[in-house]
Swiss-Prot record:
Residue ranges of the region described as Disordered: 21-44, 176-204, 489-508
InterPro entries documented for this protein: Slu7_dom, Splicing_factor_SLU7
Tissues expressing the protein: Mainly expressed in tissues undergoing cell proliferation, particularly in lateral organs.
Molecular function per GO: pre-mRNA 3'-splice site binding; single-stranded RNA binding; zinc ion binding
Biological role: Participates in the second catalytic step of pre-mRNA splicing, when the free hydroxyl group of exon I attacks the 3'-splice site to generate spliced mRNA and the excised lariat intron. Together with SMP2, involved in the timing of cell cycle arrest during leaf development, in a STRUWWELPETER (SWP) dependent manner; promotes cell proliferation in developing organs.
Swiss-Prot/TrEMBL keywords: Metal-binding, mRNA processing, mRNA splicing, Nucleus, Phosphoprotein, Spliceosome, Zinc, Zinc-finger
Protein's name according to its UniProt entry: Pre-mRNA-splicing factor SLU7-A
Originating organism: Arabidopsis thaliana
Chief location category: nucleus
GN (gene name): SMP1
Listed Basic and acidic residues bias regions: 176-190, 489-501
Cellular localization per UniProt: Nucleus
Length: 535
């Protein structure tokens, strides 16, 4: 068990140690220094910064985390390809039976198999190969480019350049050939049109030949290799990550503290430098700028919506939360604009150049305005031409004239069919003839009825009673009997409300006197009477 060799501490000392570590992490206290005078990052966990017990380390240090084993003398050299060391003149015992070299056997020989080997001919003895042995480290064994000679790639470049020169030469020959054909073929309009087409072809070929005349946005300035390997791009279209990391801007140990766990540097690493020349001002500078505020507002909105019962969570469904927040912002802006428009429509806009009415400035006006029964202004403002309150030049339901073009018996109608019912279907001249026939028939019936009657009956004159009923004029009522009838009517109505008080052997008198009839008429509720609630 690798534990740190620390002495026993009391509860108070342990609390102070914890507070000191928290202050070091927050940057309020200076960092701990090891035995070599180097600062120890306070964010390193204790199980990594504490030395094992068997090292007997009394001072804080990180030497136990560093590599203490010395590496062997690894080399990055590679085999000398095709190198020869010694060439014998005659066959040697143990050499290759095919070529005569001592460095390999006949089974591993890479030369052409001879019809009669060098062992028997003792001629054309091959030289011995240079045998090398390297001690490679872990990375050297897996380096796929180890031993590669970059100078050999010039042959590939020369091959592509030769192909490009041949292509340009061929295009130039084609261009000269078309120019000769153009000079030899000058025949009228057809020749002119052909010449224009040839000029277009020449322009295209010229663009292919001369790459220096390409557009500025497609100009190839420099070829760079991307991190993925194999793909290339232009300097204009490809961003090269040559910017310096923020923890390397200031190598002073007392400068802004960098937290490797969260990759944050809250303070400005170069506080004395020109702000125009700096691209990084510290994390605190960007916490309240850019999209950081939008993200903060999004979190606050998701919390408030969740507290109000909305199924919205920023960590569980971030896309849904962002979509709901955007819809909320749109609805909020729409409501705000509607409120603004409503207020401006009601009170006006003081920023406009329109003259403010006197009614709004003084609260009153001396201008006299007169209206007609239809609510139209007839006097008091600018002169208004008389205009019909009905829609003009609108012919509905097959009519050929507008409503109000016909007048009869104090009623408006349609002139085309003489109908006085609005929105009725037009019957034309047939409807006019039918109406006239019905009118003639009605007049004939009235005349026939008057002729058959010998003497008209006298209409009995009636007068309205006080409560709206018709009674004969010669009717005489007894005032005392009328008062008794009114009392009796009130008593009967009270008994009707509660029939349980009616006696079993009650007797009714069905004879109605004129006074009782008048009392009934006086007590009866008239629903059409506007004063019935005050009786």
């Amino acid at each position: 068990m690798a534990t740190a060799s620390v002495a026993f501490k009391s509860r108070e000392d342990h609390r102070k140690q914890i507070e000191l570590e928290e202050a070091r992490k927050a940057g309020l206290a200076p960092a701990e220094v090891d035995e070599d005078g180097k600062e120890i990052n306070p964010h390193i966990p204790q199980y990594m910064s504490s030395a094992p017990w068997y090292l007997n380390s009394e001072k804080p240090s990180l030497k136990h985390q560093r590599k203490w084993k010395s590496d062997p003398n690894y080399t990055k050299s590679w085999y000398d390809r095709g190198a020869k060391i010694f060439q014998a003149e005659k066959y040697r015992k143990g050499a290759c039976q095919n070529c005569g070299a001592m460095t390999h056997t006949a089974k591993a020989c890479m030369d052409r198999p001879r019809k009669i080997g060098a062992k028997y001919t003792n001629m054309n003895i091959a030289p011995d190969e240079k045998i090398e042995s390297f001690e490679l480290d872990y990375d050297g064994k897996r380096d796929r480019w180890n031993g590669y000679d970059p100078s050999t790639y010039h042959r590939v470049i020369d091959l592509y350049e030769a192909k490009e020169d041949a292509r340009k030469k061929y295009l130039k020959e084609q261009q000269l050939k078309k120019l000769e054909e153009k000079n030899n073929n000058e025949k009228g309009d057809d020749a002119n049109s052909d010449g224009e087409e040839d000029e277009d072809d020449l322009r295209v070929d010229e663009a292919k030949v001369d790459e220096s005349r390409q557009m500025d946005f497609a100009k190839v300035e420099k070829r760079v290799r991307t991190t993925g390997g194999g793909s290339t791009g232009t300097v204009r279209n490809l961003r090269i990550r040559e910017d310096t990391a923020k923890y390397l801007l200031n190598l002073d140990v007392n400068s802004a503290h960098y937290d490797p766990k969260t990759r944050s540097m809250r303070e400005d690493p170069l506080p004395d430098a020109d702000p125009n020349d700096k691209f990084y001002l510290g994390d605190n500078q960007y916490r309240n700028s850019g999209q950081a505020l939008e993200f903060k507002q999004l979190n606050i909105h998701s919390w408030e919506a969740f507290d109000k019962g909305q199924d919205m969570h920023m960590q569980a469904a971030p896309s849904q939360a962002e979509l709901l927040y955007k819809s909320f912002q749109v609805a909020k802006e729409k409501l705000k604009s509607q409120t603004k428009d409503t207020i401006m429509d009601k009170y006006g806009n003081a920023a406009t150049e329109d003259e403010i009415p006197m009614e709004l400035l003084l609260g009153q006006s001396e201008r006299q305005v007169e209206y007609d029964r239809a609510g139209r202004i007839i006097k008091g403002q600018e002169v208004i031409l008389p205009k019909s309150k009905y829609e003009e030049d609108v012919h509905a339901n097959n009519h050929t004239s507008v409503w109000g073009s016909y007048w009869k018996d104090h009623q408006w109608g349609y002139k085309c069919c003489q109908q006085i019912i609005r929105n009725s279907y037009c019957t034309g001249s047939a409807g006019i003839e039918a109406a006239e026939a019905a009118l003639d028939l009605m007049k004939a019936n009235i005349a026939r009825k008057e002729a058959t009657e010998e003497s008209p009956k006298k209409v009995e004159e009636k007068r309205m009673a006080s409560w709206g009923t018709d009674i004969p004029e010669d009717l005489e009522l007894n005032e005392e009997a009328l008062a008794n009838a009114l009392k009796k009517e009130d008593l009967s109505r009270r008994e009707e409300k509660d029939e349980r008080k009616r006696k079993y052997n009650v007797k009714y008198n069905n004879d109605v006197t004129p006074e009782e009839m008048e009392a009934y008429r006086m007590k009866r509720v008239h629903h059409e009477d506007p004063m019935k609630d005050f009786l």
